[in-house]
Curated annotation (Swiss-Prot):
Keywords: RNA-binding, Stress response
GO MF terms held by the record: RNA binding
InterPro entries: Hfq (IPR005001), LSM_dom_sf (IPR010920), Sm (IPR047575)
CDD domains, alphabetized: Hfq
Annotated region described as Disordered, given as residue ranges: 63-102
Residue ranges with Low complexity bias: 70-88
Domain Sm: 9-68
GO biological process, alphabetically ordered: regulation of DNA-templated transcription; regulation of RNA stability; regulation of translation, ncRNA-mediated
Function text: RNA chaperone that binds small regulatory RNA (sRNAs) and mRNAs to facilitate mRNA translational regulation in response to envelope stress, environmental stress and changes in metabolite concentrations. Also binds with high specificity to tRNAs.
Species this protein is from: Salmonella heidelberg (strain SL476)
Protein family according to the UniProt entry: Belongs to the Hfq family.
UniProt protein name: RNA-binding protein Hfq
Self-association state and partner proteins as the record states: Homohexamer.
Amino acid sequence: MAKGQSLQDPFVNALRRERVPVSIYLVNGIKLQGQIESFDQFVILLKNTVSQMVYKHAISTVVPSRPVSHHSNNAGGGASNNYHHGSNAQGSTAQQDSEETE
């Protein structure tokens, strides 16, 4: 189980540490927005006007409002080349959405 969290924990912790605004999409399609205040193995505490405890099993996607460096102790930085965040990823999603509506 620790192997599976080697990407998740540093990513979520970087979002928390840098107070990056995030959009969290749940599996039922609901979009939540705020800043990650805290997290553990099972939940994320999301703060906006109120604090919400969101169970990780209900989360589909976490989208940061800006790129985040989430690799820890990676001198080569190779892991960051495999993951792209920001306008390019969002642009391709918008393009896919427009193609579906045509």
